């Protein structure tokens, strides 16, 4: 695969110069020396122009995107993405059409790569003056300017991720990831290092930019420290997590640890093509790099994930919201932040690990001992979210070796389930990010674990909505997950509740902002439940003092979640919480002026119960948790009055937050209860009893 390196700008060519390029030997040779065989390119475009009619000049419906971080932009190189249903042959036809129309206007363009296996589109080098023309071409969905990506690196780590039963001896987990292949997109790798010798295949793939301040590439073997270290963390003989996993190395970062979005996309397509040509067992792709938010990068990750590939990436080392970076912001990617030996967030000078709702979990990422490229027996200590991501890639390889049929959703849920919980000091994170950032540090599952029919659930937060009254936020579950409940949260308390809606064949959680509000979050409880069938039952506002109630009507369906939505701006106060009458079926109870929604599901062996915890006096926080063996599927506040900020699930605990009672003058009439719905599968109970 060729190297994509040049980043020079393109300028319009006047007709005399264009003729000179076509006819003048000296001019043609000069241009060839600079940019390759452009004389042939121009002649070809003349021929192409004769054979292609211009498309009708409709207004552009496609959109243009570029990196929000100006220093990382690479103007002059663009990824043109075609619409989803576009036939494969149209990628090359559209590229030729662009070249022909650009040549007619006196511009040269160069097609650097045509995507066939990852997404429909192509990579083109051209003047920014041609963007309007390109956006009007048939089949074009959007165009994204290329941008830079960077490596994210600035033996306690193995002990931290190992279950307690292993620690008395040494780190020797079963199977060692031998059934899994890990692709590493990084710098090159010193494959003869004793840690990884015989475990790594360095592919011939290379797509890296020129180094800053130079006009050449150093040999890969002269700058393979980052990739060598990460390869050792994943599967090194002494310091590796998955000692049996095999690695394949793709070079997408240069000697300065810098690459491009386009180069990484071509690397991902290389993996997809390899997967199609020679299908193998489970694949893990490690992306220990970060760039600014990129729609096309995230879309490519989604395509690869839906093809069955597990992608693990670094959250980034910018002490910032991970949702502002790619591929960390891609929902289909497992995004990993970094912690130190004390399970605290890693600080790197004035920066540190990224955080926020786009992070799935944390892993060891400070002073990690691994292979050094200085010599074949050298080791070095490195820090960063790249190292943390390498740990999780190793754990993923271990899990997939034990259960090769796991889907991405099942693997992610297990990573979350077996993580160490509530060990990170949240004060390190900005105040507005603490509730959004998962307090989880990755760990291997115990060897005696049997997943069976265990019910796994996780909490997914939406992006923050806008501040207008009609603004909404939407939280979505992954492709193989089921939305079992929906809640909302607003720091100002000004919200109009939430409800489950159907969108594109999937259920989503939609939260509603209120007048004067600062925005709202939607919070989805996403679970793995085979053969599940769910529906929503709604009761309109009762208008009576007893409140609004609704329960599951269909036989065999059980209550998995409650939500409420109201149109009035202020629900006002409510007498002490109206709890579920004892002895009656599980039901959702809410404010008399609110519509109440019950999420009702049927699945083999599924049983659920409601747990409530109310405090007579107003409290800023009320919690209720499910017992061992039960999984939290629903979390709501009762009643959902306007002084309640919202409800959300943290692992197996339902948390209800209210306004600061010391400043609001709240009374006992504004007391609130936390309502948890806890579910389990009888199949799991029976299986556990049989093992005892």
Swiss-Prot record:
<keyword id="KW-0443">Lipid metabolism</keyword>
<keyword id="KW-0106">Calcium</keyword>
<feature type="active site" description="Charge relay system">
    <location>
        <position position="226"/>
    </location>
</feature>
<keyword id="KW-0765">Sulfation</keyword>
<feature type="site" description="Cleavage; by autolysis">
    <location>
        <begin position="152"/>
        <end position="153"/>
    </location>
</feature>
<feature type="disulfide bond">
    <location>
        <begin position="457"/>
        <end position="527"/>
    </location>
</feature>
<feature type="active site" description="Charge relay system">
    <location>
        <position position="386"/>
    </location>
</feature>
<feature type="disulfide bond">
    <location>
        <begin position="608"/>
        <end position="679"/>
    </location>
</feature>
<feature type="modified residue" description="Phosphoserine">
    <location>
        <position position="688"/>
    </location>
</feature>
<keyword id="KW-0967">Endosome</keyword>
<dbReference type="GO" id="GO:0004252">
    <property type="term" value="F:serine-type endopeptidase activity"/>
</dbReference>
<keyword id="KW-0732">Signal</keyword>
<feature type="domain" description="Inhibitor I9">
    <location>
        <begin position="77"/>
        <end position="149"/>
    </location>
</feature>
<feature type="disulfide bond">
    <location>
        <begin position="534"/>
        <end position="601"/>
    </location>
</feature>
<feature type="signal peptide">
    <location>
        <begin position="1"/>
        <end position="30"/>
    </location>
</feature>
<dbReference type="Pfam" id="PF05922">
    <property type="entry name" value="Inhibitor_I9"/>
</dbReference>
<dbReference type="GO" id="GO:0008203">
    <property type="term" value="P:cholesterol metabolic process"/>
</dbReference>
<dbReference type="InterPro" id="IPR050131">
    <property type="entry name" value="Peptidase_S8_subtilisin-like"/>
</dbReference>
<feature type="disulfide bond">
    <location>
        <begin position="562"/>
        <end position="588"/>
    </location>
</feature>
<dbReference type="InterPro" id="IPR000209">
    <property type="entry name" value="Peptidase_S8/S53_dom"/>
</dbReference>
<keyword id="KW-0645">Protease</keyword>
<feature type="disulfide bond">
    <location>
        <begin position="626"/>
        <end position="678"/>
    </location>
</feature>
<dbReference type="GO" id="GO:0005764">
    <property type="term" value="C:lysosome"/>
</dbReference>
<keyword id="KW-0153">Cholesterol metabolism</keyword>
<dbReference type="GO" id="GO:0005737">
    <property type="term" value="C:cytoplasm"/>
</dbReference>
<feature type="site" description="Cleavage; by furin and PCSK5">
    <location>
        <begin position="218"/>
        <end position="219"/>
    </location>
</feature>
<keyword id="KW-0865">Zymogen</keyword>
<keyword id="KW-0378">Hydrolase</keyword>
<keyword id="KW-0333">Golgi apparatus</keyword>
<dbReference type="InterPro" id="IPR036852">
    <property type="entry name" value="Peptidase_S8/S53_dom_sf"/>
</dbReference>
<keyword id="KW-0325">Glycoprotein</keyword>
<feature type="disulfide bond">
    <location>
        <begin position="486"/>
        <end position="509"/>
    </location>
</feature>
<keyword id="KW-0964">Secreted</keyword>
<keyword id="KW-0068">Autocatalytic cleavage</keyword>
<dbReference type="GO" id="GO:0034189">
    <property type="term" value="F:very-low-density lipoprotein particle binding"/>
</dbReference>
<keyword id="KW-0720">Serine protease</keyword>
<comment type="similarity">
    <text>Belongs to the peptidase S8 family.</text>
</comment>
<keyword id="KW-0053">Apoptosis</keyword>
<dbReference type="Pfam" id="PF18464">
    <property type="entry name" value="PCSK9_C2"/>
</dbReference>
<feature type="disulfide bond">
    <location>
        <begin position="323"/>
        <end position="358"/>
    </location>
</feature>
<keyword id="KW-0256">Endoplasmic reticulum</keyword>
<keyword id="KW-0458">Lysosome</keyword>
């Amino acid at each position: 695969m060729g190297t994509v390196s040049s980043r020079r700008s393109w300028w319009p060519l006047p007709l005399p110069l264009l003729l000179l390029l076509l006819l003048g030997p000296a001019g043609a040779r000069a241009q060839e020396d600079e940019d390759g065989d452009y004389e042939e390119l121009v002649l070809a475009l003349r021929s192409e122009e004769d054979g292609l009619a211009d498309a009708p000049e409709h207004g552009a419906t496609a959109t243009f995107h570029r990196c929000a971080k100006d220093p990382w932009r690479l103007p002059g190189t663009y990824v043109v993405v075609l619409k989803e249903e576009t036939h494969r042959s149209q990628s090359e036809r559209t590229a030729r059409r662009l070249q022909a129309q650009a040549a007619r206007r006196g511009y040269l363009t160069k097609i650097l790569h045509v995507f066939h296996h990852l997404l429909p589109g192509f990579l083109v080098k051209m003047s920014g003056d041609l963007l309007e023309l390109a956006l009007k071409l048939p089949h074009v969905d959007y165009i994204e300017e290329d941008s830079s990506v960077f490596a994210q690196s600035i033996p306690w780590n193995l002990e931290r991720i190992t279950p307690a039963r292993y620690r008395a001896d040494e780190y020797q987990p079963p199977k060692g990831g031998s059934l899994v292949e890990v692709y590493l997109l990084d710098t090159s790798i010193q494959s003869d290092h004793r840690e990884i010798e015989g475990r790594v295949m360095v592919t011939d793939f290379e797509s890296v930019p020129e180094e800053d301040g130079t006009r050449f590439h150093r040999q890969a073997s002269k700058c393979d420290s980052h990739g060598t270290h990460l390869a050792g963390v994943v599967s090194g003989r002494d310091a590796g997590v998955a000692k049996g996993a095999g690695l394949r190395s793709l070079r997408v970062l240069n000697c300065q640890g810098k690459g491009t979005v386009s180069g990484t996309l071509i690397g991902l397509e290389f993996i997809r093509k390899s997967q199609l040509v020679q299908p193998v067992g489970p694949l893990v792709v490690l992306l220990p790099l970060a760039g600014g938010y990129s729609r096309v990068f995230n879309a490519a990750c989604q395509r690869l994930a839906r093809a069955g590939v597990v992608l693990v990436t670094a959250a980034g080392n910018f002490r910032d919201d991970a949702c502002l970076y790619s591929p960390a912001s891609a929902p289909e990617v497992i995004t990993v932040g970094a912690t130190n030996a004390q399970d605290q967030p890693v600080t790197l000078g004035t920066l540190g690990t990224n955080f926020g709702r786009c992070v799935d979990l944390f892993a060891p990422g400070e002073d990690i001992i691994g292979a050094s490229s200085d010599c074949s027996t050298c080791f070095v200590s490195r820090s960063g979210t790249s190292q943390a991501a390498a740990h999780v890639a190793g754990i993923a390889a271990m899990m997939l070796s034990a259960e090769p049929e796991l889907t991405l959703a099942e693997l992610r849920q297990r990573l979350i389930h077996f993580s160490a919980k509530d060990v990170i000091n949240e004060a390190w994170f900005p105040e507005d990010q603490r509730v959004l950032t998962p307090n989880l540090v990755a760990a291997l599952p115990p060897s005696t674990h049997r997943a069976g029919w265990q019910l796994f659930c996780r909490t997914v937060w939406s992006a923050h909505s806008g501040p207008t009254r009609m603004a909404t936020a939407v939280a979505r579950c992954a492709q193989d997950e089921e939305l079992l409940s929906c809640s909302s949260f607003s720091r100002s308390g000004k919200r109009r509740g939430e409800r489950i809606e159907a969108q594109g064949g999937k259920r989503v959680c939609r939260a509603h902002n209120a007048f004067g509000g600062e925005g709202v979050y939607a919070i989805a409880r996403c679970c793995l439940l085979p053969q599940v069938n769910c529906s929503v039952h709604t009761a309109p506002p009762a208008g009576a003092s007893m409140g609004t109630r609704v329960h599951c009507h269909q036989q065999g369906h059980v209550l998995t979640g409650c939500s409420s939505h109201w149109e009035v701006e202020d629900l006002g106060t409510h007498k002490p919480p109206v709890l579920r009458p004892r002895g009656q079926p599980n039901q959702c109870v809410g404010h008399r002026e609110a519509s109440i929604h019950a999420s009702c599901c049927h699945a083999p062996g599924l049983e659920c119960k409601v747990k409530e915890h109310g405090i007579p006096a107003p409290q800023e926080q009320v919690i209720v948790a499910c017992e061992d063996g039960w999984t939290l599927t629903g979390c709501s506040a009762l009643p959902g009055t306007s002084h309640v900020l919202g409800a959300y699930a943290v692992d197996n605990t339902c948390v209800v937050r209210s306004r600061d009672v010391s400043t609001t003058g709240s009374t006992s009439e504004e007391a609130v209860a936390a309502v948890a719905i806890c579910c389990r599968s009888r199949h799991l109970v029976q299986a556990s009893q049989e093992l005892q």
